[in-house]
Amino acid sequence: NMMSSGIRSIEFDDFAAGVKAVLTGAEPAVSFQEAGQLLDKYFAELEAEQKAQAEAMSAAMREEGEAFLKMNAEKEGVVTLPSGLQYKVITEGSGKKPSATSQVKCHYEGTFLNGAKFDSSYDRNEPAVFGLNQVIAGWTEGVQLMSEGSKYEFYIPYNLAYGEHGAPGAIPPYAALKFVVELIEVL
């Protein structure tokens, strides 16, 4: 499929002439070597354009996250830790606190800064069970602050979330994220 390979337009007369030359055995207007060089040049330019677009989107995502976290730090009830992780207590529990290697059972909802939801255990009607050493750094640090029964909102800078590469297909590079986390049980 030409569209999926990045070819957005084609000169149909030239294309038809090339196909006709191949099918009839005539001498094409452009040699196979020249055609290969033209395609190599085209795809190199396309790759450079896509890379520039991705870098611009990454820079915008990073700036958006930094601006949000700076403004969010001024809000009442929001605590900013030295790592840059921010949190707000919604409900304070009184049960056990986990360590960095604890297995925990949590309900959570993850959203982008614009409020778009990307994951939710609530939607699945089943809490998640995981080791705090098997999740993003913002979760490892943040959930340790909680006691069983607590519900916090975390504001996680990109470097404590999915970093400069993101999670392909799910989380863009440099994305700061919001999570509402309810610590049900330390296992």
Identify the meaning behind each predicted range.
Residues 1-187:
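Cross-family detector of peptidyl-prolyl cis-trans isomerase
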